[in-house]
């Protein structure tokens, strides 16, 4: 009998910059209060980079921790997939910069732009490379410097986002191992592009005095429509992937959702009839770090002892685009 080859997560590493911006700091910057932010988002503070620190820098720090935790050299990595919407520059890709900074001699890689679903999309992509049998070590990273595209006079967005990164190493399962990435469902619905976007800097609106004056290089968000879609879609995607695998919310040992808003996560868990002790919420400390949220939440789950070998783990995300996804995996260590 031949075992099914799956991709398993064998190591994890995360990084957030040391500088913290609290709700009380924001009270001095815009018309808001700590209580208002907490009640509507669940966020108390977020970490921000200093000037000159980019997405590749956070990615490299997370990757170094990941590889050290696995006890391998960077040179063993064969492929790098980076989920980000805040690349250091339009090109070269963040993956190229990470490869160079880590000193990996024979890897290839690329970036995945899927908003807050970026880590999930990257994880699936990396898993498929492992499943193909062509690669044995794929580095998957989610890294975003959201502060680079936030208008800190706009209270609708500046209270939400933070900077951070996380990395996982994917390797093939051994014969007889029933762990790894079990299933996934992803979707894009471009009709949602009008609700969360950054219009400046691309080929449609290249950088100019006009785009700067019109604040087109900042995030624009219709929070109400994004919230409604996220609550509906995250529940829908998680229910689909569970049903396809003959599981229910009670079979899940750990639910790790994109940390966009505490109310979205709670609403999804309630719809799945999942006890809140199985739900990972760390948005209070980090805010929304876009592609960084899920690996950062994985680290929280590990630290809290909620991830053990064989645990059924459900991941879910909704992001700009709209993009959405749910991934079912069985924890490997």
UniProtKB/Swiss-Prot annotation:
It is an enzyme of class 2 (transferase). The active site is at 116, 258, 288. Keywords: Acyltransferase, Cytoplasm, Fatty acid biosynthesis, Fatty acid metabolism, Lipid biosynthesis, Lipid metabolism, Multifunctional enzyme, Transferase. InterPro entries: ACP_syn_III_C, ACP_syn_III_N, FabH, Thiolase-like. It is found in: Cytoplasm. Pathway: Lipid metabolism; fatty acid biosynthesis. It catalyses: malonyl-[ACP] + acetyl-CoA + H(+) = 3-oxobutanoyl-[ACP] + CO2 + CoA. It comes from the Bacteria. GO terms for biological process: fatty acid biosynthetic process; secondary metabolite biosynthetic process. GO terms for molecular function: 3-oxoacyl-[acyl-carrier-protein] synthase activity; beta-ketoacyl-acyl-carrier-protein synthase III activity. Its EC number is 2.3.1.180. The keyword Lipid biosynthesis applies. The keyword Acyltransferase applies. Residues 259-263 are annotated as: ACP-binding. It holds the Pfam family ACP_syn_III. One of its GO terms (cellular component) is cytoplasm. Homodimer. The last Arg residue of the ACP-binding site is essential for the weak association between ACP/AcpP and FabH. PANTHER family: 3-OXOACYL-[ACYL-CARRIER-PROTEIN] SYNTHASE 3, BETA-KETOACYL-[ACYL-CARRIER-PROTEIN] SYNTHASE III. Catalyzes the condensation reaction of fatty acid synthesis by the addition to an acyl acceptor of two carbons from malonyl-ACP. Catalyzes the first condensation reaction which initiates fatty acid synthesis and may therefore play a role in governing the total rate of fatty acid production. Possesses both acetoacetyl-ACP synthase and acetyl transacylase activities. Its substrate specificity determines the biosynthesis of branched-chain and/or straight-chain of fatty acids. Belongs to the thiolase-like superfamily. FabH family. This is Beta-ketoacyl-[acyl-carrier-protein] synthase III. It comes from Koribacter versatilis (strain Ellin345).
């Amino acid at each position: 009998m031949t075992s099914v080859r799956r991709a398993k997560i064998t190591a994890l590493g995360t990084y957030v910059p040391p500088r913290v911006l609290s709700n009380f700091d924001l009270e001095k910057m815009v018309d808001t209060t700590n209580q208002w932010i907490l009640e509507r988002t669940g966020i108390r503070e977020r970490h921000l980079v200093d000037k000159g620190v980019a997405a590749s820098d956070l990615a490299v720090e997370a990757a170094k921790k990941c590889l050290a935790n696995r006890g391998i050299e960077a040179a063993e990595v064969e492929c790098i997939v980076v989920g980000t919407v805040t690349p250091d520059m339009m090109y070269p890709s963040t993956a190229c910069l990470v490869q160079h900074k880590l000193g990996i001699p024979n890897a290839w890689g690329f970036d995945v732009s899927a908003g807050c679903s970026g880590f999930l999309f990257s994880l699936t992509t990396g898993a498929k490379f492992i499943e193909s049998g062509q690669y044995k070590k794929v580095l998957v990273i989610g890294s975003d410097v959201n502060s680079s595209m936030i208008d800190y006079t706009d209270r609708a967005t500046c209270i939400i986002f933070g900077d951070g990164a996380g990395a996982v190493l994917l390797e093939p399962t051994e014969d007889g191992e029933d762990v790894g990435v079990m299933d996934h469902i992803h979707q894009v619905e471009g009709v949602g592009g009008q609700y969360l976007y950054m219009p400046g800097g691309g080929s449609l609106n290249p950088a100019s005095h006009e785009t700067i004056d019109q604040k087109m290089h900042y995030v624009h968000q219709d929070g109400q429509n994004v919230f409604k879609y996220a609550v509906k879609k995250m529940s829908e995607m998680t229910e689909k992937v569970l049903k396809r695998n003959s599981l229910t919310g009670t079979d899940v040992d750990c639910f790790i959702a994109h940390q966009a808003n505490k109310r979205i996560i709670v609403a999804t868990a309630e719809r799945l009839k999942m006890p809140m002790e199985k739900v990972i919420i760390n948005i209070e400390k980090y805010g929304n770090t876009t592609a960084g949220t899920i690996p950062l939440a994985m680290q929280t789950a590990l630290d809290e002892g909620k991830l053990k070998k064989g645990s059924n783990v459900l991941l879910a995300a909704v992001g700009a685009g709209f993009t959405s996804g749910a991934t079912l995996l069985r924890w490997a260590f």
